[in-house]
């Protein structure tokens, strides 16, 4: 991290977390933030569920919820971006305060509740984005007051799919009441059938991923793997934030919401490895949760991920983190004799299954 980035983070950390979040997006949009540019190599370039990525380090949904800073983020060293979640209608989300830094734990807790500008506005921004080598996907959500949340996911995809490179069905946010109930076998099967029917009508392929929670039993994971394999989706994103609070030291540790960051790394990686085992490599996995270094990205890949995503670590290490991780990952692949990311996927899975 350079001096300018460190100074900017210090200033942001003196502010309310949600205001700092908004200010960081404004700074990106205005061109005030020095950006590292694209990062790729023959080892880093990879294909995940039909997506051709310059590198496997992606931006998780939740940072640029409303797709307002895409041009800048495409120059920040990420291999792919995910915006949203978008819901059919705009909604304000939960009351503030709803975002908390857990500095001692290198973590955050949020209870945003799918606050966003709505599918129509976000779709328009996706349509206007610059085209380039960095795929941009949309996280699909449901309105809090919707009488048919499963239909909401299909509706957002129908509206925005033509302007997105991929889509992620988010049934795992802990901040919308009973949303996680849609991870059950029957509900998930019906939901994915509706989404895939919409996808089948597109003129070009739009890979659909499913984002799951880290707080699932082994039986739940087995059911999800079975449904996912049968549904025709492109892959699984593992995982969203957790409701667990094990070992936290921060004063905000008991705030309601989803916990992200360093404390999630082990839990989410174990879920990832188990899914890799259950799907036997037949379904690409994207590893999310606690990635803050090249070594942690590499561990996720060796546990079974074809790519990774990050967000919370940027709160503590700045916008240049993705590029640093991608370059470090390239060096680790070279060190261990892997000619590509794909060659390394799952080679350390057994370490996470004990």
UniProtKB/Swiss-Prot annotation:
A matching Pfam family: DHO_dh
Cofactor: FMN
Cofactor note: Binds 1 FMN per subunit.
GO MF annotations in UniProt: dihydroorotate dehydrogenase (quinone) activity
Active site, UniProt feature: 173
Alphabetized UniProt keyword annotations: Cell membrane, Flavoprotein, FMN, Membrane, Oxidoreductase, Pyrimidine biosynthesis
Binding site for substrate: 65, 110-114, 170, 175, 240-241
PROSITE patterns referenced in this protein's UniProt entry, alphabetically: DHODEHASE_1, DHODEHASE_2
Compartments it resides in: Cell membrane
Regions crossing the membrane: none
Cellular component, GO, one term: cytoplasm
Chain positions recorded as FMN binding sites: 61-65, 85, 139, 170, 211, 239, 261, 290, 311-312
E.C. no: 1.3.5.2
Summary of the function given for this chain in its UniProt record: Catalyzes the conversion of dihydroorotate to orotate with quinone as electron acceptor.
Family statement drawn from the similarity comment of this UniProt entry: Belongs to the dihydroorotate dehydrogenase family. Type 2 subfamily.
Oligomeric and partner information: Monomer.
UniProt protein name: Dihydroorotate dehydrogenase (quinone)
Source species of the chain: Cereibacter sphaeroides (strain KD131 / KCTC 12085) (Rhodobacter sphaeroides)
Lineage: Bacteria, Pseudomonadati, Pseudomonadota, Alphaproteobacteria, Rhodobacterales
């Amino acid at each position: 991290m350079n001096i300018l980035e460190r100074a900017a983070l210090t200033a942001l950390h003196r502010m309310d977390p949600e205001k700092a979040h908004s200010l960081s997006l404004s700074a990106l949009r205005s061109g005030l933030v020095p950006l590292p540019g694209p990062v790729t190599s023959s080892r880093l370039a990879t294909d995940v569920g039909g997506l051709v990525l310059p590198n496997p380090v992606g931006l998780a949904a939740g940072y640029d919820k409303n797709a307002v800073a895409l041009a800048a983020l495409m120059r920040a060293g990420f291999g792919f971006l995910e915006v949203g979640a978008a819901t059919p209608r705009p909604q304000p989300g939960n009351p503030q305060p709803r975002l908390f830094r857990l500095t001692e734990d290198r973590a955050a807790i949020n209870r945003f509740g799918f606050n966003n500008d709505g599918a129509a506005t976000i779709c328009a921004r996706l349509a206007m984005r610059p085209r380039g080598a960095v795929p941009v996907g949309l996280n699909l959500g449901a309105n809090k007051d919707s009488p048919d949340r499963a239909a909401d996911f299909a509706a957002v995809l129908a509206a925005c799919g033509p302007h997105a490179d991929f889509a992620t069905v988010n049934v795992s946010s802990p901040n919308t009441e009973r949303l996680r109930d849609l991870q059950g076998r029957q509900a998930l099967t019906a939901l994915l059938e509706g989404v895939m029917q919409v996808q089948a009508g597109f003129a070009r392929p739009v890979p659909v991923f499913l984002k799951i929670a880290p707080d699932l039993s082994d039986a739940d994971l087995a059911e999800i793997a079975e449904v996912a394999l049968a549904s025709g989706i492109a892959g699984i994103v593992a995982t969203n934030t957790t409701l667990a609070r094990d070992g936290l030291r921060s004063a905000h540790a008991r705030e309601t919401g989803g916990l992200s960051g360093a404390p999630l790394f082990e839990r989410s990686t174990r879920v990832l490895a188990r899914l890799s085992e259950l799907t036997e490599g037949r379904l690409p996995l994207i590893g999310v949760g606690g990635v803050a270094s090249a070594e942690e990205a590499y561990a996720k890949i060796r546990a079974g991920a074809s790519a990774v995503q990050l967000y919370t670590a940027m709160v503590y290490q700045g916008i240049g983190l993705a590029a640093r991780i991608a370059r470090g990952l390239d060096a680790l692949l070279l060190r261990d004799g892997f000619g590509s990311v794909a060659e390394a996927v799952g080679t350390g899975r057994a370490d996470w299954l004990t």
